[in-house]
């Protein structure tokens, strides 16, 4: 029965495609449930990717700030780079040089202004994607 469901999703009955689908699904499930240790300025923080809403670079302090879904903010260690943050989850995308968002909370992107809207409780947040980062963000999304 399980294989029949997979056949419909994969649009074929080739066992090779079914196995590829299973391994892709397993990697996505692992990526979303995995906890990552992140060094803040005051402690070692263990977080799941879905608990992170966004990261912003503070020009004044030259530190990345990680904003959690519950609203708490953590200042990350000075050596933390955007590349390190993006490596936490495939759902993280850099929308500007100083901002990284979790695509799980992205609801839409306006075509011309590149204004982002987010799903609740972040529907009041305002963010814009830079033209430079837009292509990379689109590549991470499954666009029909």
Over which residues does each language-model region extend?
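Short, low-complexity N-terminal regulatory "tails/caps" that precede and couple sensory modules
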Residues: 1-27
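Short, charged, intrinsically disordered terminal tails
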Residues: 142-144
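Conserved binding/recognition cores within well-folded domains
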Residues: 18-122
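C-terminal catalytic core of Y-nucleophile DNA break-rejoin enzymes
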Residues: 124-127
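Structured alpha-helical
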Residues: 135
